[in-house]
Regions:
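N-terminal pro-sequences and low-complexity stem/linker regions of secreted or lumenal proteins
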Residues: 2-714
């Protein structure tokens, strides 16, 4: 594998090498320079949040170059030597397969199960070996750029987060509760919602009874609004389940329980807002003549932007047809809607120069994503936990009762709430241009943490564990030196074109799952995408006590953000993998009881990997790695009684090596490995006697921006 050349690095850092042809809406957004008064987050005056529906990261971006997709070099191990892509289903395995719009109805692909029970069955506490058994074979389908022209163009132009997770192993409403309140109940009222409930209008004496973030904004004098058309918000506004908003709706003149087909919801107005300020969270803020009146549905947002009245914080809830939800919507329809929102925001350049648009997805539906979620440790049957944490995680376990009055929530089962699988997240703004990837761990609470950073209104419902693990999105921006860019113009899909495509797709049969002999993993092209600096500095070392049959692993976090380490025992893959949450500035250690041999596979953020393999019959060399600038210092220490020979294999990033090291009993040897030419990426495999192996891979962070893993893909 060739090393990364200077030319490749410069090309990636400049623009991602991907701005070839972009829709006018994106081109216009890129052409408007950022407002720069302080060169900090204080320059942001408006944050707009559009949460779409039910797509996994791999389904949309598994083949997108330069992100952690199908070319991921370090994935979880499965039983029988299978790769994570070879998911068991009855008597065969199913690989991710292309939902090819030329072969069938890809745009309106069938939805899959996506509730608490089947989500946990698929995740299986991190084992993830039988995904389609829980989620159906359709869950393994993915899209290419031909099915996702706008979403891929948006990623090429702005910033895509490739480690953004939904907040729960669950469906729509529980995840959206995190977006609007920072919790599904445990930290707000010592209760829990894990199934959809109270997601529409209802009586004010029923519903969730903890405080929401819009209420805190209102109290702090921060202007906010939820833009939605009633009656069609597709049940995607979780604020509808809270009594204060229900009461505001009834007092505004709406029925508490509207009959089916009711479409006479009272339009929002400034006069109503003066009396009922929470009505803008659950009211008809985008009144339209009927369900096909898309211009009417967006007119209120357009007027606010044109008049310079866009609130400081806005949430947009799309109607069903444009929500991107499987069955009821499609990628092209959702892309068209997002494009319309972006067009509206850029109609007023002064407003757009101060605006951040966050486009994310509430959950993955049931669609497959290969990365293990950075969840809290899972409970074992004996009451112990598979892993540890330096921060309490009782808020992350389903041990809380249902909210009072609930009729749908199941009995607590002790399982982990989340975070769940990865979903796409676009950071669209004048400060995030350039086709960047950001690989920090985020979830829906990260959106609220970003609002906290900008507007100073804290959300106490966000648990200490979530704050330790999930970042605040600020690493996705460069406020001091925003990148200018102006790509060329191409024609965009109109609403008529989108709807015609959708109709033609619906006339076709579903895309079939390929026969076993015709399967093949989709190609992710190798590309070093410009990648934001991350707050991680992690160290892992292992030591063997042969006499006691114990392998000890120590995890140290010297970075500024907590991290979750996943450890798979490849000799016992039927066991729950252990997960360790290590806060910034802290460390953890744990033991593995081994028989004659051990084989541990450890994964962390942004491709961080350690592998430890060997036998237990004698003392073995120990390896530690310490970062120094863009270099890695590797120290080998031998505590055995006879000499040990270790070979350090050729580094695939730099082509340097191999190296031979002969260790005498009691001797320590250190070597320095420079990673500047590879953007900080390293991959070192150490091979010794009797099957002894250590592997160390990852990216060294220095506070400077870099590139994504240049060896991902083919």
């Amino acid at each position: 594998m060739p090393k990364v050349t200077r030319r490749q690095f410069i090309q990636a850092s400049a623009m991602g090498g991907a701005l070839l042809a972009l829709p006018p809406s994106i081109r216009k957004a890129l052409a408007i320079p950022a407002h720069r008064r302080t060169g900090t987050i204080r320059d942001v005056e408006h944050v707009v949040i559009l949460m779409q529906e039910n797509r996994s990261f791999d389904q949309y971006f598994g083949t997108f170059p330069g992100v952690r997709g199908f070319g991921d070099r370090f994935t979880i191990p499965l039983p029988g030597g299978r790769s994570v892509w070879q998911q068991a289903y009855t008597d065969r395995v199913i690989l991710p397969y292309h939902l090819n719009a030329k072969r069938g109805n890809a745009q309106r692909v069938n939805g899959t199960p996506h509730e608490w029970p089947d989500a946990h069955q698929a995740w299986d506490d991190g084992r993830m070996s039988k995904w389609p058994v829980a989620k159906t074979p359709t869950s393994m389908g993915y899209f290419e750029e031909q099915e996702l022209p706008f979403q891929r163009a948006l990623a090429k132009a702005f910033t895509l987060c490739d480690v953004y997770h939904c907040s729960m192993h669950a469906g729509t409403n529980p995840n959206r509760l995190f977006l609007w309140t920072g919790t599904n109940g445990p930290t707000g009222a010592n209760v829990a919602a894990v199934l959809n409930e109270w997601d529409g209008p209802g009586r004010a004496d029923e519903g969730y009874r903890w405080k929401t973030y819009p209420e805190r904004l209102e109290e702090a004098g921060i202007r906010w609004k939820v833009y939605q058309y009633l009656p069609d918000n597709f049940g995607d506004n979780s604020l509808a389940g809270f009594p204060p908003y229900r009461e505001a709706s009834v007092r505004a003149g709406n029925p508490a329980n509207p009959p089916k087909g009711f479409n006479a919801f009272v339009p929002y107005s400034d006069a109503i807002n003066a009396l009922l300020p929470l009505y803008k969270g659950n009211g008809n803020t985008l009144p339209a003549r009927h369900n096909d009146d898309l211009e009417g549905m967006l007119a209120g947002l357009r007027k606010d932007v044109r008049d310079g009245r866009l609130p400081q914080v806005s949430w947009i809830v799309a109607p069903q047809r444009y929500s991107e939800h499987p069955d009821g919507s499609s990628p092209v329809q959702g892309g068209w809607y997002t494009r319309e929102v972006l067009d509206i925001l850029t109609e007023n350049p002064e407003v757009w120069s101060k605006t951040v648009l966050l486009v994310n997805y509430d959950e993955n539906d049931g669609y497959f994503d290969h990365m293990p979620s950075p969840s809290a440790p899972s409970p074992r049957a004996d009451g112990t936990f598979a892993g540890r944490s330096t921060v309490p995680f009782d808020t992350e376990l389903f041990r809380h009762p249902a909210p009072p009055g609930s009729k749908l929530q199941p009995a607590p089962d002790g399982a982990v709430y989340g975070p769940g699988p990865r979903v796409p997240m676009f950071v669209v703004s004048p400060w995030s241009r350039g086709g960047w990837v950001n690989s920090q761990v985020f979830d829906h609470t990260s959106v609220l943490q970003f609002l906290e950073r900008r507007f100073g209104v804290r959300e106490p419902n966000i648990s200490a564990w979530r704050r330790a693990v999930c970042g605040d999105l600020t690493s996705a921006f460069d406020f001091a030196n925003p990148s200018p860019s102006a790509p060329p113009r191409i024609a965009a899909m109109t609403r008529t074109v989108v709807e015609t495509l959708r109709e033609r797709q619906e006339a076709m049969a579903q895309v079939p799952v390929p026969a076993v002999e015709k399967q093949g993993l989709g190609l992710q092209r190798r590309f070093a995408r410009p990648s934001r600096a991350l707050p991680y500095c992690l160290e892992v070392s292992g030591s063997v006590r042969a006499s006691g049959g114990v392998v000890n692993v120590k995890m140290v976090n010297r970075g500024a953000q907590g991290a979750v380490f996943h450890v798979y025992d490849r000799l016992r893959l039927e066991e729950i993998p252990r997960r360790y949450t290590v806060e910034a500035g802290k460390s953890l250690a744990d033991d593995w009881r081994a028989g004659d041999a051990y084989d541990l596979w450890l994964l962390g953020p942004n491709g961080f990997h350690r592998a430890l393999r060997g036998r237990m019959d004698e003392a073995q060399p120990e390896v530690t790695a310490v970062e120094e600038g863009r270099a890695l210092w590797l120290t080998l220490t031998h505590r055995g009684s006879t000499p040990a020979r270790v070979t350090i294999a050729r580094c695939p990033y730099t082509s340097a090596g191999p190296w031979e090291v002969l260790l005498q009993p009691g001797e320590s040897v250190s070597r320095r490995f420079e990673t500047s030419s590879s953007g900080g990426w390293y991959d070192l495999t150490l091979d010794g006697d009797k099957g002894w192996i250590r592997r160390l891979a990852g990216r060294i962070e220095t506070g400077e921006h870099s590139i994504s893993d240049p060896l991902m893909g083919a």
